[in-house]
């Protein structure tokens, strides 16, 4: 959506880059246009850099009660800061919001909800677990339809469009608003095959029956897209789109595998915003 540009009164009409699925010449990856994946740490579409990185999760607390402050501060890999935060926790009465670096809402809940702290702890775990990446494989990823600006409503569906400049093996890891983790791809042996360079790849698949259906929990999902130069054996232990928690056996398999990645790896993160539909209890006809 163009509301982001319009709301900021851009003085000159920008030339919007084509979506991956509509860009067979990969114009969007042309460094002349300024779209190379620079080493930034957060945002709707981000890339990990090969340089040393700070994996600490920096959290700012606004009007937070002492018990909640203590619970957040006790999480491994979390540092409480006054500025330059990765996450902000804002408490008002019994309500609390978890916000991203640009003030975008990740989840809104009651202050006694343990899932709030679980979400913070899970993102800190992801920060520590992800390997340092580079642009060696030319990874580019986004949601499709791209006109939605990574924002979808309950019962809508979408896919991730991925393009590579070099052949690679893909993995998508979802962190949902409640702190749950899911390996979205690969979920079966047929998906652990090399993806060719050049052509756009729809993940999980181009068939509408394979598209991702938006359901609860709603908020902001942080989806990490990884491209590996070589096949990674640990992915065979993660069959099925099973939701898991930090500290589970599945999380241990993933952390151990990512700690011993062989070959080049590229990493990008896409934040997907989802909202409940008015009066909808299910996505049935």
Question: What function would you assign to each model-found segment?
Answer:
Residues 2-285:
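Secretory-pathway glycoprotein ectodomains that are cysteine- and/or Ser/Thr/Pro-rich
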């Amino acid at each position: 959506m163009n509301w982001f540009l319009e709301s900021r009164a851009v003085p000159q009409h920008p030339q919007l880059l084509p979506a991956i699925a509509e860009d067979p010449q990969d114009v969007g990856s042309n460094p002349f246009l300024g779209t190379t994946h620079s080493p930034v740490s957060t945002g709707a579409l981000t890339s990990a850099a090969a340089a040393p990185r700070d994996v600490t999760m920096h959290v700012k607390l606004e009007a937070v009660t002492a018990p909640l402050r203590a619970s957040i501060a006790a999480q491994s890999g979390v540092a409480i800061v006054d500025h330059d935060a990765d996450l902000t926790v804002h408490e008002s009465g019994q309500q609390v919001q978890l916000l991203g670096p640009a003030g975008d809402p990740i989840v809104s809940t009651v202050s006694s909800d343990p899932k709030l702290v679980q979400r913070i702890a899970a993102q800190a775990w992801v920060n520590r677990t992800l390997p340092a990446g580079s642009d060696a494989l030319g990874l580019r990823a986004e949601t499709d339809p791209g006109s939605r600006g990574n924002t979808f409503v309950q019962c809508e569906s979408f896919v991730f469009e991925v393009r590579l400049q070099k052949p690679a093996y893909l993995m998508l890891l979802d962190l949902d608003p409640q702190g749950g983790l899911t390996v979205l791809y690969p979920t079966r042996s047929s998906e652990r095959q090399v993806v060719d360079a050049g052509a756009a790849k729809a993940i999980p698949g181009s068939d509408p029956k394979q598209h991702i259906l938006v359901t609860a929990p709603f908020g902001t999902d942080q989806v990490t897209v990884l491209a590996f130069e070589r096949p990674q054996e640990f992915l065979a232990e993660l069959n099925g789109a099973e939701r898991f928690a930090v500290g589970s056996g599945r999380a241990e398999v993933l952390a151990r595998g990512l700690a011993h990645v062989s070959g080049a790896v590229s990493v990008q993160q896409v934040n997907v915003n989802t909202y409940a539909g008015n009066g909808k209890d299910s996505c049935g006809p």
